[in-house]
């Protein structure tokens, strides 16, 4: 890495209501140095608990809470669980393709997902320009893993940051009425992609044990969590 982690400039946001845990406040540390905006540097930053939103690189830095733990899957060591194998079997008619751009009909699917699953979230109401600001960056390769059914109908898109040694599951949206767990299938297909491309790690963002919606991440073995600046698991 071209910049020593101990000497990067960090800015702290003000405290504001936590997006995941009611009655708590969150604060994030933001990396301010623009020279960090490279693939090599970002891989090191992710290994130290950072993540991005648009071009902003950040990590949780809350005063009275450490519930957010970075989590990643060791791709060569991944072994699907029995339930994941059943899901793969049920979804064997589906197929995926990693693309550099979104399919033209992506926004209809994204809108349905936001309206039915996240109407009370920060992405509501769904807007194309807001989605672009959230997902796009000028210094990193981002792919869009499209999942289709047997008739080539678009079911899901897993936005994926792609680097030399790892990938990062950035954001996924899907058909909220489809009977299979497309969120879990999205990660399984991202793992297939990582295995094919010889990536060492798939980062899943932050795990919050007290947030039930996030606990699917812990079902992927072997995973590691960053606790007290050491990867464990």
From Swiss-Prot:
This is Aspartate/glutamate leucyltransferase. The keyword Nucleus does not apply. It catalyses: N-terminal L-glutamyl-[protein] + L-leucyl-tRNA(Leu) = N-terminal L-leucyl-L-glutamyl-[protein] + tRNA(Leu) + H(+); N-terminal L-aspartyl-[protein] + L-leucyl-tRNA(Leu) = N-terminal L-leucyl-L-aspartyl-[protein] + tRNA(Leu) + H(+). Transmembrane segments: none annotated. GO terms for molecular function: arginyl-tRNA--protein transferase activity; leucyl-tRNA--protein transferase activity. GO terms for cellular component: cytoplasm. Its main location: cytoplasm. Functions in the N-end rule pathway of protein degradation where it conjugates Leu from its aminoacyl-tRNA to the N-termini of proteins containing an N-terminal aspartate or glutamate. The keyword Cytoplasm applies. Belongs to the R-transferase family. Bpt subfamily. The gene is bpt. It is found in: Cytoplasm. Keywords: Acyltransferase, Cytoplasm, Transferase. One of its GO terms (biological process) is ubiquitin-dependent protein catabolic process via the N-end rule pathway. Its EC number is 2.3.2.29.
